[in-house]
């Protein structure tokens, strides 16, 4: 007997964003009467979180209460479909089945459950990250290198037994550079290396000590603040977070979840929460054959430690943090992560978790992304250098990014040698490749890359980063980020495929957009010391008219004299070709929109809100006949009228091109609270009504029960 067939395929991994609609098709035996259903956990994230939390805190059981059945719509002989809105962030499962009339045994498609990962709406594109080591924004910022005289002076004091810790850069120093970082360079996410207190006169390595040797995960290092009797170091961190949010950005902080510094808050109060060697000494973590002796490794066999760390993440969310880099996160067990993230998402569902899995097994990273609900991870693209290495690595990276969680291409991290130490040409090459080979704009740099800094970052020091160096790649990076923001080939659903043909240390990456079918071709010469020619088959990226380079903005000529198309690249050159001249205008328009939210992200968030409003009134039903564009237009134009129309009959979701103005009468089920008008009065919100918050400026709001 033929078994039903399902799309998306059983066992497949699928990544979407909040506000998307999941389309499920089932092809059942056509000669049988019956009904089809989708058994899924979608829409019941709270139930799953409650069970995960209960298991860790009270020893409860995972009963699978999040599983439920949704009826599918019959569309033809033996054919059924369901269009399911995705309104919650998390990892979900689904599988369709057919129930013949008069039979109590369902017929299932062959294979395991389908995996559906739903990411926050605002992170659907332009996920550009600027990693800032606050300490480096101090007096050394613009220096090329420390002078020998300065080093000798400090060494003399060291020999006399003094502890010498120079002035550090501060949060306010970083604030002064935000217009450049976020406005000029166009980075949307500011990721701070750890900002917690660190050892000073004891257990310190290097001049300043490592920010990864955290003494208190809840605290802020006073060295990162200016002495100001009106504020605290935490207040000044909040100033930075507010300044980033004011510029439509996101703030991530780095929490080294696997370890603390020696004599930390946790080590003194809970020494049993740490791993010990056979001789009962505290165990230090390590990777790549290096042991970090100034760190003490946590032991996640203790569930009380899980609860403590979950509270640390929740505390920083409350303080305005949007996401976290989870240093050495692959060393934390899967069940601990599942619990921690469940606790955080129960209050802050759109929180972003970036896994630092470098040095860990790839299968561990993939499991944490696809099951434990971490969002992104570091890619190892920066550790692959020539054509053969990248050809071997990139296809797998593309697949994981499209199905389990974006692998972010950092051109350079604090652990690596500076790109410009090899050559400025090489730095531009690797920066452009990291950006234009990224998934949904998941691209990052570490401070100083833009200025061709050559001194490797030492986390125990405050190395100069050549700030305002006259030789730089500022304009180059700004252009790359504008391309990532504007062009649909860098947005969700884009297909990425290597198509280079012929010899040479070159790459050709075809990017085909999902939204309007447009394509771009990225060519890269991996040699920074000699030119090379990149080739591809004409059928892959045909040249029938003019071709333009989005990076330089110039029209180019393609060699069509041989069987494959060819383009001569200068040393280290990276280009991004399009056949559509309108793409140039698209990128240019984005370049002129300083520090604004990407249009694509706004649309995605509005889709999510429109679907959320509808489902709150009508339930999580089939959306096959939805015209989401109509709903988004009306919601943007008049939120109150939109809610009234949806509460009445939901006609805004039909397939009419222009459904016309809302004509319903009566009170809209919406209470408006406006700042500052309503700050001194109690505003009543009836049960089941929406709360519409209005303010002339960007704001954060906390809803407390």
Model-derived features: positions:
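Active-site-adjacent "subsite" loops/lids of carbohydrate-active enzymes
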Residues: 263-319, 329-330
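N-terminal structural segment of carbohydrate-active enzymes
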Residues: 2-250, 258-260, 572, 579-582, ...
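Aromatic/acidic polysaccharide-binding cleft in carbohydrate-active enzymes
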Residues: 405-475
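Glycan-recognition and catalytic regions of carbohydrate-active enzymes
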Residues: 454-520, 526, 630-631, 639-662, ...
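Surface-exposed beta-strand/loop patches in extracellular or lumenal glycoproteins
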Residues: 27-29, 36-40, 526-544
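The substrate-binding groove and active-site-proximal loops of carbohydrate-active enzymes
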Residues: 135-139, 153-172, 213-234, 262, ...
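Active-site-proximal helices and loops of the catalytic beta/alpha 8
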Residues: 241, 311-314, 322, 327-407, ...
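Aromatic- and acidic-residue-enriched segments that line the glycan-binding/catalytic groove
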Residues: 147-149, 198-218, 257-287, 342, ...
């Amino acid at each position: 007997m033929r078994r039903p067939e399902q799309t998306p395929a059983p066992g497949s991994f699928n990544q979407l964003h909040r506000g998307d609609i999941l389309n499920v098709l089932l092809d059942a035996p056509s000669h049988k009467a019956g009904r089809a259903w989708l058994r899924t956990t979608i829409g019941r994230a709270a139930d799953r979180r409650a069970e995960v939390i209960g298991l860790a805190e009270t020893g409860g059981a995972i009963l699978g209460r999040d599983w439920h059945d949704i009826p599918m719509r019959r569309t033809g002989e033996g054919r059924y479909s369901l269009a399911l809105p995705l309104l919650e962030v998390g990892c979900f499962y689904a599988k369709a089945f057919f129930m013949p009339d008069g039979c109590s045994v369902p017929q299932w498609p062959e294979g395991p459950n389908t995996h559906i990962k739903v990411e926050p709406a605002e992170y659907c594109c332009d996920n550009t990250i600027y990693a800032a080591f606050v300490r480096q924004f101090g007096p050394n910022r613009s220096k090329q290198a420390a002078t020998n005289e300065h080093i000798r002076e400090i060494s003399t004091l060291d020999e006399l037994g003094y502890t010498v810790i120079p002035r550090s850069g501060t949060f306010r120093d970083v604030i002064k550079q935000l217009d450049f970082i976020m406005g000029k360079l166009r980075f949307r996410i500011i990721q701070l290396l750890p900002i917690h207190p660190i050892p000073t006169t004891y257990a310190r390595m290097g001049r300043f000590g490592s920010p990864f040797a955290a003494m208190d995960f809840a605290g802020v290092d006073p060295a990162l603040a200016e002495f100001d009797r009106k504020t605290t170091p935490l207040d000044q961190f909040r100033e930075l977070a507010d300044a980033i949010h004011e510029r439509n950005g996101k703030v991530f902080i780095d929490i080294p979840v696997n370890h603390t510094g020696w004599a930390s808050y946790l080590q003194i109060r809970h020494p049993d929460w740490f791993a010990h060697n056979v001789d009962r000494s505290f165990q230090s973590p390590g990777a790549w054959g290096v042991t970090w002796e100034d760190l003490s490794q946590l032991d996640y066999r203790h569930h009380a430690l899980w609860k403590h760390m979950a509270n640390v993440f929740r505390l920083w969310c409350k303080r305005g943090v949007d996401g976290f880099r989870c240093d050495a996160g692959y060393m934390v067990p899967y069940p601990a992560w599942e619990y921690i993230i469940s606790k955080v998402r129960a209050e802050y569902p759109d929180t972003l978790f970036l896994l630092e899995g470098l040095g860990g097994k790839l299968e561990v990273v993939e499991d944490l992304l696809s099951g434990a609900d971490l969002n992104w991870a570091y890619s190892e693209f920066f550790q692959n250098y020539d054509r053969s290495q990248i050809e071997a690595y990139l296809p797998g990276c593309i697949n994981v990014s499209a199905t389990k969680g974006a692998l972010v291409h950092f051109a350079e991290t604090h652990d690596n040698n500076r790109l410009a130490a090899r050559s400025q040409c090489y730095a531009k090459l690797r920066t452009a490749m990291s950006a234009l080979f990224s998934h949904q704009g998941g691209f990052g740099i570490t401070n100083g890359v833009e200025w061709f800094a050559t001194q490797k970052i030492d986390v125990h020091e405050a190395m100069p980063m050549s700030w305002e160096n006259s030789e730089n790649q500022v304009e180059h990076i700004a252009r790359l980020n504008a391309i990532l923001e504007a062009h649909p080939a860098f947005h969700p659903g884009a297909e990425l495929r290597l198509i280079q043909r012929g010899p040479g240390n070159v790459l050709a990456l075809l990017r085909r957009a999902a939204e309007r079918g447009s394509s771009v071709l990225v060519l890269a010469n991996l040699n920074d010391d000699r030119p090379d020619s990149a080739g591809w088959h004409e059928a892959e990226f045909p040249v029938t008219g003019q071709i333009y380079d989005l990076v330089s903005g110039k029209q180019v000529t393609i060699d069509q004299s041989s069987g494959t198309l060819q383009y001569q690249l200068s040393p280290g050159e990276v280009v991004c070709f399009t056949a559509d001249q309108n793409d140039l205008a698209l990128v240019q328009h984005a370049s002129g929109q300083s520090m604004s939210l990407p249009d694509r992200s706004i649309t995605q968030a509005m889709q999510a809100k429109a679907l959320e409003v509808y489902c709150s009134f009508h339930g999580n039903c089939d959306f096959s006949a939805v015209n989401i564009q109509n709903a988004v237009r009306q919601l943007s134009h008049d939120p109150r009228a939109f809610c009234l129309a949806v509460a009445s009959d939901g006609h805004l979701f039909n397939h009419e091109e222009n459904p016309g103005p809302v004509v319903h009468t009566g009170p809209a089920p919406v209470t408006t609270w406006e700042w500052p008008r309503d700050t001194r009065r109690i505003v009543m919100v009836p049960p089941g009504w929406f709360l519409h918050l209005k303010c002339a400026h960007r704001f954060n709001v906390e809803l407390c029960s």
